Structures are given as structure tokens and as C-alpha cells.
Amino acid sequence: MGVSLRHLSPSSFWVSRRPRVSSSILSFLVPRRRILCTRKVAIIKGNAGYSTATDCGGSHGFHHSGHQRSSSVEFSGEWKLNLGSKTARMVPPTVKQAGAVSAWREEVNNKLRGRNREYANNQDDAFGNGSYILKGFVPKIDDVHSYGNGQNFDYNLKPGTDITTLGRELNGFMQTNSIRGSVVALPSKDIEVGETTDVTLKPLNSDTTLDNASYKKTATISKVEKCTNLSQVRANLKKIYNRVRVVDNVSSAKETVALLMNQYRNLVHACDTEVSRIDVKTETPVDHGEMICFSIYCGSEADFGDGKSCIWVDVLGENGRDILAEFKPFFEDSSIKKVWHNYSFDNHIIRNYGIKLSGFHGDTMHMARLWDSSRRISGGYSLEALTSDPKVLGGTETKEEAELFGKISMKKIFGKGKLKKDGSEGKLVIIPPVKELQMEDREAWISYSALDSISTLKLYESMKKQLQAKKWFLDGKLISKKNMFDFYQEYWQPFGELLAKMESEGMLVDRDYLAQIEIVAKAEQEIAVSRFRNWASKHCPDAKHMNVGSDTQLRQLFFGGISNSCNDEDLPYEKLFKVPNVDKVIEEGKKRATKFRNIKLHRISDRPLPTEKFTASGWPSVSGDTLKALAGKVSAEYDYMEGVLDTCLEENIGDDDCISLPDEVVETQHVNTSVESDTSAYGTAFDAFGGGESGKEACHAIAALCEVCSIDSLISNFILPLQGSNVSGKDGRVHCSLNINTETGRLSARRPNLQNQPALEKDRYKIRQAFIASPGNSLIVADYGQLELRILAHLASCESMKEAFIAGGDFHSRTAMNMYPHIREAVENGEVLLEWHPQPGQEKPPVPLLKDAFASERRKAKMLNFSIAYGKTAIGLSRDWKVSREEAQDTVNLWYNDRQEVRKWQELRKKEAIQKGYVLTLLGRARKFPEYRSRAQKNHIERAAINTPVQGSAADVAMCAMLEISNNQRLKELGWKLLLQVHDEVILEGPSESAENAKDIVVNCMSEPFNGKNILSVDLSVDAKCAQNWYAGK
């Protein structure tokens, strides 16, 4: 895939080390010695007393036990090493203008002053508001461009330090203007990942008492990166160009295809396309984008003339379509093996030109994810990230190739300064369009784009070798004479091809329906906005004009006057805000209405509202959870809104809008104004506003604000995106991207995220109803029942859970019965029923159902069933239930009392994760874990060790079911195709006349997904429906 960023560089290494740093000893920042311009260090083992940052100008700290007082200040910025003057400076995280830089600098100074107030405040007179002291921390910023990593700035002061000593220490240690000796000395040899080496540290200022101190520590290399030398990169590009055959005419294309399909047909061919006119973040490649070139590489043994082993094909010119047509037989030949990096993208791009790819042999992105599922966080799966990591290539490349295959971004090679109005280049770097590069910087572009296919084949060979070295365990048992590359070929290779087919099929969307519910949603949103504004304006008149979507304005309204939780700043009681002057108000002193006007917002309660949630900057949160806590579990409707609905509906829905509002919207015009005496459902705002009618009004109004946010989420995340042409093809079908990029192996979706549909109970506009079958067709929506709990019962060999599944019925009610003796007694005495199957003429059960009579206990049982499967602890449950940790632990123990096998299995998985560094799913996929360095990290690993085998095995089952459905010959004959998988649910489309027959086949495939068998010790329950839209199929 040729539209991502890539890396290409010479082989000189940066080495990265990260230390463990004691917070009780003095640290100061010093620049690196010049040799470190080609090495970066990050220690993962060894108690070295210094710290480092990233990029060419890192920061180093040196610690001394003579200073006992320590604190840490965190802010954004990065130390940049100036090799010319041997100085280091802190620079802002992004390109900024001078005014913004000053504000950034002031912010840093304020943070430092806030953490060391007793020193800074005492020096205001002597040093001009502490500027001398603080300049020691934040050097003058001349270059405001570059970098963007947050830093931990360790600031230490010895108690009783006098002014002179303090000034000398800060000047010497922090401004780094007197550099002497090496900061970190490394051996001159090449350093590799995992190697242990000694590092030496020295202080930098001869005026300090630390002058003769030096530390030598042992460090283990954790990361190796390659340094960028642009001239060397261009030289390497030249070497690649000399190995590339350029195909830019039909005659050359015919010769090349003949060699590919005859002499070299038995080789593995790595292919890649380069595409323009597409935004890969927002647009589907189906019917979008223009292919400008592609490359093919089948190894150095191939010779396409003059020793050239790589093919680069130009399809940009006038005869581009004719050239591409010559390669159609090659691409469609199923016997010629082809590998890709992100196959689905290239597949869609080539299909746009009427070519149906065949001969899919592997996707190196999927292979890398199978090899190490944790790289999504630690390195990524882009071609540049993988080929730049020596651990990935695993020694498969030669020394010369090692210099060529590490890649840097297009921006580094092709970036140019954006032209200013006067024609000169500015500092903002932009990348010219790839079409322009192909025509104007042709040789470099050919080399750069051809490198994609060369790197893909190298990556394929490496991943094949790495996977062959891994044993394959199926359901915990070793499969002899097979390895994880066999697993890839048997499962993930056909699964990758199936996902590409599903993306190509897409789902038909009823845009008229979406347009209608958009009108309704916006109308309801306006109603909710008016409800909140009308209430708030009773307490603060200008709130009638506020922006209810502004966190800043809401925070002022609810929490004005509150103190910051991180420092001594206070939020003002009242504040002016600039808002659009929609009413054309002419403010005092002005002759006409301006575009914006000022409003004054102040706190609307006698004291700041109660809250337990704060932002990272220390101010009260106004997130959805905070608002829900204030409102409680009440509706947005209340009698003070009389007349508001009619006005909003008239303004938002005209006579020409042919749409029926849902009943619940219309009924809000006749709200019952009688308010119940029970106040348990009301939130914390009830007491804050004095209880009674005022408290109830406040809760209902804030509930209306919650409704505003909820509706806005549905509009912005679902209703509007699904109507966009960027996610659909020419046929009006929505084509999302399906990816195996989660650590557990579950699928994710994007552009758009169809897996993120609102829960049925929250789908107030029935958005799934917009996904429809084509005329003459129907949908089959099939869903596993309690899949993960059934997998847990199998993995843990839990007899109690197995028996409950065999008995059938409401699993959560059975769990509650086994947890609570009083419920079991009620069931045995016939006072309640576990479940009830009505007979003709029966309207209600003879006695209450367990789920109704003991709703609270069943609710806890249901939450525990899923929470324990995901590794949730009593601590998390106590927060969810708002009970003590002891009470939550007692309830958890009740669950385990009948399921001791689950507890034992979980303990084994936790031990396995810590000792071996990985856990396995049902089909043998591994999830790796890093070494933990804190209790919190260990807890996270242990939770993931419990969750991954369950959730990952569910992904295995779903994948096998999809392969079983896709390979079913009868379903193919009937014309049914898979469209989408959403967690444990699959959706197919096909002719309506065979829907019921096809549904039975689908259920059978999902019930026995392992090549026509079920290897689990529990049955797989499947529910399926035939319908005309997704919502009706649920």
C-alpha cells in the first residue's frame, strides 16, 4: 500500500535506553556529547542514575544523594541539542508563533513556581519576580519549530539553600552554558538490542561540588533506531533505482508480463500500489483514489533485463490504462502467488480498474500481528515501522540490504518549505502531491515506491521464518509437526481474503431514512437545549444565550469559584464569554449589532456543585459521567418546559418535511407535572439546589443537557457519517474497513465504524433500520448467545457453568439462584419461576419470575458473569456498584463459591503471563506481555491474561464460523454472501426466496464452526432471523 509514511535510512544506529530514576536524588539536565548524535539510549534494566528523552536532542539527568528534597514538574516540550554551540534548549511541542511561545514559556514558569513556591516567592524582589531562577529552568527559545514529546522535569532543592548557592546551581546545572566533559559515554562499537554495556556519567559545571563525581552504570539496550542522513538516503535511493526496471509503455509491459507468467511464475511475488486523490483516513478505497504506479518484486534471482530484479510500472500517462491491461492476466492468475502489505487496500484499488485479484498468498501486516499482537502500541504495523525494526527482519537481510530497507518518511525525503506570499520558502514543511513527485523527482520517487514491494517480500520471508519457529497449540495441546505459519495458512490467510471480499460487498444504506431521522434528532436536540437553557436562565439570565456544548461555559456555570485540584488557582465566580450574536443585540456603546456579543456567566448554585471527577489540569470535569451523576436517573421532561416543544418543532420541522415523529417525542407535550415524593432517583444536584421542587428542576434540566450530548453523539457518529459519499461506492453501499488489529484478535472496523452502533436500548432513532437489503434480497442476522461465557466454561472446565448451559433458559437467573441461598429456597418452594413458557390463553405466569422478584440480585449476577470473564476485580466492581470494597468482595466470593474451577484457571493464566510473558487463545494465538515494573502494570497484565483467552477465543470461534459460512457450497449456489461481522454477530445478504433455507445452513455452520465440528465441551447457541433491515433482524 503506497500511501502511508515510510522510512529509509543508512545503517548508523541510534540506541535508546530508559533508566529507573530515584526521585530522592538531585537531577539536572545536560546535553549529550557529540557522539550521541548517532546513538540514542533507553535503559530497561540497571539502576542508572540519569534520565533520557527521545529524538536527536534528548535530556539527561544526573543524581546526587546530597540533596534530599525532590519534586517533579511535567509539561510539554523537548530538549534540543545544538551541536554548534554545544547547548541544549527546551522548545515548545509544536510550531508556534512568538506570542504563543511566550504563553508556553509563562505556563512552564508558573508550573515550576507553583511546585517550589517557598523558594520562588522569597526571591521575587531580588530577582525580578523570580525570573532569574526560572530562566534557569526554561532557557531562551530562539527556534520555536520542532518536536512534540512530553517531558518529566525533575527539580530538586536542598532544604535551607541560600540565594547564592541556588543561583549557582540553577545556572550551572539547568542552563547548561558551561559544559565540560562527557555526559554519557558509550563504547564506539555497534550496539544491538538486548546487549548489555557500560555507560559513564559526569557533571558539567566545575563550580559545583559535584565536579569530581562520576557514575558508571550497566544498561541493557531496549531499542535501536536508525539515524537520518539525507545525503546518504539519496545515495541509497540511487542504488535501488539501479535495480529497478521501469515499465512505461505497452511493449515493455508485454515483455515483463511474459517473464512473470512463465520463467518466474513459481516465485512469490510481492506487490504494492501507489495512489493519489484519496484521503485514506476518511475515504474508502472502493471507487475512490487513482492508481499512479505499482511495483512487483519476486527476489534478487529474477532478471527483467540488465540485472534489474524489481518492476516499477507507470500507469499515470495517457497509455496508463493500456499498460495496466497487460498485467491483468498476471493479477488474475490464481496459480501465481502474491503477497501484499495491507492487502485489502490494494485489492480495492486494483478492482476499481476492473481487475479481480487472485492468487492471494499472504498479507505481511496480518502475519506481523499474528507474530506479535502487542506492536499496535509498542511499534505499529506499518511497513516502515516493521522493516526498520531489526527484531522483525530477524537477520534475513544482507549487510547491504540492512542499509537500504530501513525507511524514513516521505516528508524527510520529499518535503519542501511551503511558499510564502513573497515566493520564498517558509518553515512549514509540506509534501508535494505524489503525481508531482512521479513527474518531477522521478528517479527518487521510483526508487522510493519500488522499495515497498522489495521490503514487503523481505518482510514476508522474515515473518514466515519467525512464525515457523513458533509451536502451534490447539486448545492447549501441541500439534506435532505444525507451527504458527501453518496456522496462518490454514486460518488467517483465507480469513484475510474473506475480509477483503466482505469490504468489497459493503452494505446498502437507506439515505432517505437517515435524512429523516436527522431532522427528528436535531429537533429533539433543540428541545433539550431549550429545556436546559430555560432552567439555567432562571439562575443566570445570560445562560439563555450560552453554548451548551462548551465545556468551559458549563464548568463556569456549575463550578464557578472552585479551586483547582492540582494547584492554588481558583475558577472565577463569574466570567465574560464571547458568543455568536444570533439575536442581533446592539451592545451598550456600539452603534450596530456585531457578529459576536459578550455574555456573563456565573455559578448558578449557592456553592460549587459536588463532583469527584477532575480533568488532568485539575479543573472539575463536565463529562457525560459527571452530568449523569448530577442528574441521577430521571428524565429530561418537566413542567417548567410548557410551550417550549411546540416552538422548537415549528422552527425545525416545516410543513414540507414529510416525517412522523416518534410517539415519545410527541407525548412530551403532555408531561405529567405531578412529581413523585420518592427522591432516590435524583442525582447530587438535588441537594445542591436545596431539594424539593428546586432540586427536582435542577436534576431534570441537567438530564436534558445529558440528552443534548447523547443526541449529538448519535448525529455526529452515526447519522451524518453514514450519509457521506466518502464511505460509499458508486452503488450507494457503505464499505467499511475490517481489520485484525486488536491485541485479542477481535475485528475492528473503521471508515465508518459499523461495529460501534449504539446499543439497542440506546438506539432511539433505530439507526440499524437504515441498513437494508437490496430489492429482491433479504438479510440474515445471526448471533451467538453468551459466547464468551460458554468459552470460559470450556476453558476452565467449570461443571456448574456447563450444567447451567445444558439446562438452558435464563443463565443469569440461574447464576443468581446459585449465588444466593434465599433465591434458591424461593425457587424450590415454588414462590418464583426461573423462566416461563406461556401456553395458549395464558397472559401472565402463576407466580413472579425470578428476574422480576429478585431483579437487584440478578443484575449483580449478570454483571459478575461478564466482569469476571474480563478479569474485573472487586475494586472495580465496588466503584460500579458504589459499595465498599469488602461488600463487593463478598459478592464476588458468592459467585466463585459455585465455580471454583474458574478461580483456579484464572490463577494459572495470571502465573503463565508473568512467568512466560504470554497467554494463548483456543486456537493457539499468543498475546505477549512486557515485563512489569510496578504493581499497577502487574495488575493490568493479570487482568489481560484472564480476558485474552476468553475474548481471543471468541474471536477464534467467530472467524472459524465465517470461514465455514464462506466455504459452504450450498450457500454459494443459493447466492448468499457475508457482509459484516460485529463481535459475535454476522450479517449475510441473498435472495429472499431462499432465506429460510440459508438461515438454517448459517445456524449449522456457526454451531459447528471447526470444519463441521464443535471442539468445545459446551454447545454453541445461535439465534438467527431473516429480515429486510438490520434492526428488524435483531
From Swiss-Prot:
Localization: Mitochondrion; Plastid, Chloroplast
The protein's Enzyme Commission number: 2.7.7.7
Transit peptide: 1-55
UniProt entry tagged with the keyword DNA repair: yes
Keyword Nuclease among UniProt keywords: yes
GO molecular function, one term: DNA binding
GO BP, sorted A to Z: DNA repair; mitochondrial DNA replication; plastid DNA replication
Pfam families: DNA_pol_A, DNA_pol_A_exo1
Tissue: Expressed in shoot apical meristem.
Region annotation Polymerase: where it falls in the sequence: 700-1030
Activity regulation remarks: Not inhibited by aphidicolin.
Domain (3'-5' exonuclease): residue spans on this chain: 270-468
Classification via InterPro entries: 3'-5'_exonuclease_dom, DNA-dir_DNA_pol_A_palm_dom, DNA/RNA_pol_sf, DNA_polymerase_A, RNaseH-like_sf, RNaseH_sf
Gene Ontology cellular-component annotations: chloroplast; mitochondrion
Observed effect of gene inactivation: No visible phenotype under normal growth conditions, but mutant plants have reduced levels of DNA in both mitochondria and plastids. Double homozygous mutants polIa and polIb are sterile.
PANTHER family in the cross-refs: DNA POLYMERASE I (PTHR10133), DNA POLYMERASE NU (PTHR10133:SF27)
Functional note: In addition to polymerase activity, this DNA polymerase exhibits 5'-3' exonuclease activity. Required for DNA replication and accumulation in plastids and mitochondria.
Family of the protein in this entry: Belongs to the DNA polymerase type-A family.
The name this protein goes by in its record: DNA polymerase I B, chloroplastic/mitochondrial
Organism: Arabidopsis thaliana
Lineage: Eukaryota, Viridiplantae, Streptophyta, Embryophyta, Tracheophyta
